[in-house]
């Protein structure tokens, strides 16, 4: 049997099998030794290089992302620096107690009541959706009242066109500010009461530098809110960008603006910051060289025949001004639908003939629909036009 398999005896076969097993074992040992050598080389390379070669790509990615991160950090630093400048021009004092606030708020309600009864001069009261303004001492043209838009176009009304500052403002508000050395004696000659309903706002602006001295002093009543700096407004629907600084204003607190906060950056009241009724009394001093509307310089040929009698009765309506806004009360639900504010009132001057796809849902301005209705009464051609399919109605 051993000869048939090619081996002379059994010992030769056993010897050949042993040598084959030794070869296989040697191959395995050699492979293990080679792997150990590779591992040792890798360890030596790692000791020489702090980061593995595979980290090169990651490091390159980090280097590539550094400029982007740097731009973001630079933007944040600029924003923080601007906020610091704004804060440097702000002074806040918690000055009025709860009882004092209640007394002043009752007086503000009296002002609102007198205005509803028509007891003030025409230019004393200015109404807008969810916000009414009451000018005392000095009033000025602004926003949609201007023939030309833009900073520097504001003008003071002629003397006597707005009512005098009420005695209670002097006694309950101004005198206390003087006693605490917030303002000097005799500083204030202009007082404005802004009365906001929930959702009301005032767009970003700078108090006219050519009209008012600094500082600008305001006192808050009825509820807490916030004064925001550096916001941008967009409309239809209204949207407001993030502010550079949002300053909490508490009921009974006094806010004094000067320097950068008053002159170099806009401030506003956002709709989302008026959750309850809020009123603010703004106290300022007009500049001696502030421009003023001069009704006397207008040619008599441009004035209506009744101008002289109106002037004597105190009912002045300067033809240089645009018609006043509606004196209707704002709808309480107006805060929950798109509103047309002062900066986009130009839409109201377009054609009263609306196409079908622009029905009432596209506009919420009370004046727009009322003017459209009245125009249809004045213009029979428009009323009978086949293109006019929208039925106008008062609301």
Swiss-Prot record:
The modification N-acetylalanine is found at residue 2. The keyword Thylakoid does not apply. Widely expressed, with highest expression in testis. In testis, present in almost all testicular cell types except elongating and elongated spermatids (at protein level). Among spermatogenic cells, present at high level in spermatocytes; medium levels in spermatogonia and lower levels in round spermatids (at protein level). Residues 296-306 have a biased composition (Low complexity). Pfam families: 2OG-FeII_Oxy_2. Residues 1-28, 47-83, 294-395 are annotated as: Disordered. There is a cross-link at residue 58 (Glycyl lysine isopeptide (Lys-Gly) (interchain with G-Cter in ubiquitin)). RNA demethylase activity is inhibited following sumoylation. Inhibition is relieved following desumoylation. Inhibited by histone demethylase inhibitor IOX1. Binds 1 Fe(2+) ion per subunit. Disruption phenotype: Mice are viable, anatomically normal and reach adulthood but display impaired fertility resulting from apoptosis that affects meiotic metaphase-stage spermatocytes. Testes are significantly smaller and histological analysis of testis sections reveal aberrant tubular architecture and size. The number of spermatozoa released from cauda epididymes is dramatically reduced, and the spermatozoa are morphologically abnormal with greatly compromised motility. The modification N6-acetyllysine is found at residues 133, 236. Transmembrane segments: none annotated. Its EC number is 1.14.11.53. It is an enzyme of class 1 (oxidoreductase). Dioxygenase that specifically demethylates N(6)-methyladenosine (m6A) RNA, the most prevalent internal modification of messenger RNA (mRNA) in higher eukaryotes. Demethylates RNA by oxidative demethylation, which requires molecular oxygen, alpha-ketoglutarate and iron. Demethylation of m6A mRNA affects mRNA processing, translation and export. Can also demethylate N(6)-methyladenosine in single-stranded DNA (in vitro). This is RNA demethylase ALKBH5. It comes from Mus musculus. The gene is Alkbh5.
